[in-house]
Regions:
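Substrate-binding cleft of secreted/luminal carbohydrate-active enzymes
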Residues: 340-457
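Active-site-adjacent "subsite" loops/lids of carbohydrate-active enzymes
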Residues: 35-59, 137-219, 273-277
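Substrate-binding cleft/loops of secretory-pathway carbohydrate-active enzymes
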Residues: 144-147, 151-152, 234, 302, ...
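An active-site-proximal structural segment forming one wall of the substrate-binding cleft
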Residues: 66-74, 124-128, 156-159, 196-232, ...
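Catalytic domains of carbohydrate-active enzymes, especially glycoside hydrolases
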Residues: 60-87, 219-223, 346-359, 424-428
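Bacterial Sec-dependent N-terminal signal peptides
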Residues: 6-9, 14-38
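Aromatic- and acidic-residue-enriched segments that line the glycan-binding/catalytic groove
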Residues: 89-102, 144-189, 228-268, 321-331
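Aromatic-lined carbohydrate-binding/catalytic grooves of carbohydrate-active enzymes
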Residues: 74-116
Length: 457
């Protein structure tokens, strides 16, 4: 009986690791030398739009706040240099420079204009490095414009250049296949698709972003992180380009498009799945995986010392809706999520293509500690399993938008977020410096980080 039970156990273990090419002892992230303590990195995100009034025209403000960042105990900043409207805050010839961004002022949004001519990113690099901080840049990857609420109109590449309309993603809506550029206040009254996404499967789109990354890699950066390197949502992309590539991938024609893939208007996992539904999810994950491979190569071809990574949301159980598998190829997704993952879905996990991941462990104020998704600690614990030691990651909170955080006044909980995340991952990640300034969380962050550092002594 014991021998027979052991055999069954071995078979089960092999099944659960069927996507792994190594299948042996896992590469534990924290290393094999138990006597060596590695000090974990602490990252703070600097959103372009939210912080634009402070930094767009003032190096003094940048120095003021980066000094506070350093004093609070952070090791890294992540500077957003391509906001969701798709223009940039670094030197490149392939898209325009940001001139104005939407900012919250009083009780509404308005535009704030940049009049300075100095290099925005270079200022952060120079000041950050002088303070002993590592400086990373992030870009919103597959975006090309914004249609704003509050009557602000629109801006971005897709609105300036009609010839690029086919770069925009096509949605499988209940009203039919719809290019996002055809959505406006009448047919999208809630402005759900105000941020105009690009089609990740479009070769011209990919080449455009790859050139952006090559130009960005010319800077003396410590790292580059891709944000929104994904599909807009489950309903995208249903363009002719994507259909043709999908048919090539599966080796057959789709007779009834899009219904054989997904019924129009589907916004969540359907109870009855069309013929190609799960294969389509696999295909989208492959598109993103293959682009990540190209993006890494593009960055490293310019400067192979730059750390290459992504920002992702930690909610893996539903992240297939964005077309992203950020897990290890050794993690057999179908064994845990058979309702949406094929047996080949795990082949397109991209963790082993990265040097680092920033993980949005975004949970409410009453869900800091825990063991499952939608707790900060649980998000990080789960990620350890998902990543299988392929890449280090830093998890952390959104302290301005999640439930309980919106109105501030949570200084007592900030140290708990540090403790919960840094001890369950390889670092700490905080979104965003804007909320630290708004709610004056500097001392609370220093307390939390100091508490962690004391455990190393």
């Amino acid at each position: 009986m014991k021998k027979w039970s052991l055999s069954l156990l071995l078979i089960l273990m092999l099944a659960l690791t069927s996507c792994g090419s190594e299948g042996g002892t896992p590469k534990w992230i924290w290393g094999n030398d138990s006597t060596k303590t590695t000090v974990k990195s602490r990252y703070i995100w600097i959103d372009a739009a939210a912080n634009f009034p402070d930094y767009a025209n003032s190096k003094d403000n940048i120095e003021r706040d980066l000094t506070k960042v350093k004093n609070a105990g952070f090791t890294d900043i992540v500077v957003d240099v391509r906001p969701t409207m798709g223009d940039v805050l670094f030197n490149t010839s392939v898209v325009d420079q940001v001139k104005k961004l939407d900012v919250w002022e009083g009780s509404t949004y308005t535009y704030y204009t940049r009049t300075a001519t100095w290099d925005y990113l270079q200022a952060f690099i120079d000041i950050g490095h002088s303070l002993g901080l590592r400086v990373n840049a992030s870009i919103n990857t597959f975006v090309g414009g914004c249609l704003y609420s509050y009557g602000l109109g629109e801006q971005g590449m897709l609105f300036r250049d009609n010839s690029k309309k086919d770069w925009a993603t096509t949605l499988n809506m209940s009203s039919g296949l719809t290019n996002e550029m055809d959505l406006n206040t009448s047919n999208d009254p809630n402005n759900t698709y105000g941020t105009k996404f690009l089609n990740p499967a479009n070769d011209s789109v990919q080449n455009f972003v790859l050139q952006l990354l090559k130009d960005l890699a010319k800077y003396n950066l410590d790292g580059i992180f891709l944000d929104r390197c994904r599909y807009d949502d489950l309903s995208s992309d249903f363009s002719d380009v994507s259909l043709e590539k999908f048919e090539d991938y599966i080796g057959e024609k789709v007779t009834n498009f899009p219904s054989d893939i997904m019924q129009p208007g589907t916004t969540s996992l359907p109870s009855t799945q069309p013929k190609y539904f799960k294969k389509w999810l696999e295909f989208r994950a492959k598109v993103i995986h293959d682009f990540i491979v190209k993006a890494r190569a593009a960055v490293k071809s310019v400067n192979d010392t730059i750390k290459f990574g992504t920002y992702v949301g930690a909610w893996y159980s539903t992240y297939y809706e964005s077309g992203v598998n950020w897990a290890s190829t050794k993690y057999n997704t179908a064994a845990y999520y058979p309702e949406w993952a094929t047996s080949d879905y795990c082949k397109y996990g991209y963790a082993d293509q990265l040097d680092y991941i920033l993980l949005g462990a975004y949970a409410s104020t009453d869900n800091i500690y825990g063991s499952g998704e939608w707790t900060m600690q649980g998000f990080c614990v789960n990620a350890m399993t998902l990543l299988e030691g392929d890449v280090k990651f830093a998890g952390g909170p959104d302290i301005g938008n999640a439930t309980g955080w919106v109105n501030g006044g949570q200084s007592s909980l900030i140290p708990e977020t540090v403790d919960a995340c840094i001890n369950a991952s390889n670092g700490y990640f905080l979104f965003d410096i804007y909320y630290v300034k708004e709610f004056n969380y500097w001392n609370a962050l220093k307390t939390g980080i100091d508490n962690y550092l004391k455990t190393l002594k």
